[in-house]
Amino acid sequence: MANWMIKGANLLRPIYEEMRKELVSKQFLHADETPLEVLNEPGKAPASKSYMWVYKTGQFEGNPIVLYDYEVGISGEFAKKFLSGFSGYLHCDSWAGYDKVENARRCGCWAHLRRYFLNALDVQEDKTDYSTIAGQGFLMIEKVFSLEKTPGKKSEYTLDEIAEIRKEKSAQAVQEFFKFCEENQGRTLPKSLTG
């Protein structure tokens, strides 16, 4: 059955390539990668990790495009090659490999950032103690998330209108969060979950 999948993928490769060209022509993209184990992969130990990369157009880019790219490892070179020709905003996590994507302006992912604070809360003795740095940071990000839901459905507003709403409502919460991080930077260990 795996051979059928491989043959089918090869037949669809020209369509996939056209979709990739369309994807990299957009102004806003999302990218992420996740490890997976493939049994009996040629040239690799059985327990070694490979990666599935996902690339998606932004929510205001018209017809959505989501493409997956399987690679044998994790390297910024894979993202650089896949996103060749892209020059826009790349919404991704803080992994340094995405720095290799030329002409991309990186935008940090608040969901990934939120996860660090949530993980730090999970290892606290009292997981509901929001007076800690982890708890306060988590609540501040939750506030940003709740304000970001305010604009409503994408069809209701233009990008300029959403930017204006963000200036009015979200900007102050974001500034407060970054100020909180700067003020507490010396109170956390660099290798800790909130460092």
Regions found by a protein language model. Give the residues of each.
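Catalytic center-proximal scaffold of phosphoryl-transfer enzymes
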Residues: 1-195
